[in-house]
Amino acid sequence: MNSCKRFPRSARICLRSEYYVAFEQGRRYSSVLLRLHHLPTSGPVRLGLVVSRRVDIRAVNRNRIKRALREVMRQIAYKLVPGDYVVVVRQTAKDVSNAELSVALLSLLRRIGALPLAPIDNAMLPFFERNCSRK
């Protein structure tokens, strides 16, 4: 894989102590599939993932979930507010698709204000261009 397409190690939370700081000092936000701990910092965007064996006993499935979430963060990291983001995956995420995981993570990030809201289609077009279908 091309190195520019990877999620760099410097953008990951690796140490147990860093996870504890995010858990204890960060704000917590929840959805049905994920729980997000956000700790604003002055440094770069960093991601930590927690997928326990309770989610799925098979490592293959846990790794699939982590890869999917890491890929979403890689694609949007430049848009995010700087800070540490720790994503804890819930048991309900075991049988969902990668697309559903992506939507769940993006909606949590929008809810906390770390990611700008999605643009509304045709928001900048004049009223008559939105509602008329001329041919």
Curated annotation (Swiss-Prot):
The keyword Cytoplasm does not apply. NCBIfam families: rnpA (TIGR00188). GO terms for cellular component: ribonuclease P complex. Pfam families: Ribonuclease_P (PF00825). It comes from Xylella fastidiosa (strain 9a5c). It catalyses: Endonucleolytic cleavage of RNA, removing 5'-extranucleotides from tRNA precursor. RNaseP catalyzes the removal of the 5'-leader sequence from pre-tRNA to produce the mature 5'-terminus. It can also cleave other RNA substrates such as 4.5S RNA. The protein component plays an auxiliary but essential role in vivo by binding to the 5'-leader sequence and broadening the substrate specificity of the ribozyme. This is Ribonuclease P protein component. InterPro entries: Ribosomal_Su5_D2-typ_SF, Ribsml_uS5_D2-typ_fold_subgr, RNase_P, RNase_P_CS. Belongs to the RnpA family. Consists of a catalytic RNA component (M1 or rnpB) and a protein subunit. SUPFAM superfamilies: Ribosomal protein S5 domain 2-like (SSF54211). Signal peptide: none annotated. GO terms for biological process: tRNA 5'-leader removal. Its EC number is 3.1.26.5. One of its GO terms (molecular function) is tRNA binding. HAMAP family: RNase_P. Keywords: Endonuclease, Hydrolase, Nuclease, RNA-binding, tRNA processing.
